[in-house]
């Protein structure tokens, strides 16, 4: 949890940031929560690197540079403030990244009739013109076992469990630092 970016991002707590592997796995030094500003800077850095490294769009079942750009647009929108107190620089960056995705001509809004059956379509079907990225989970592809990743997010026809929670161990680690 973190406060909105426009509410003192330097002072409010964000999430713990760990870059790289610890040298000593037996004696971990648990990181404190970083500031909201540092958290957003890390997210932006990661997404810009992803945009640089990812390929063009192939299918919604694969992350692409357009998925990174769509997320960059969303992050900058969150940073752009409120209607009464906007940050025009971040609003412009949000617009620029969203426009990159729109102008790519890789995506289009679904018709009303197609949208009404959206959840019945395979994530990588040609008719999925509106989806930029989706975790692929098709129950028939996995028989009784479910998709290792997709089943965590969706429960379809009795397959999967559709729940993702932070583990008790993770929550305990967060509380150990005393800065939550």
Regions found by a protein language model. Name each.
Residues 1-180:
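Structured, solvent-exposed acidic/aromatic patches
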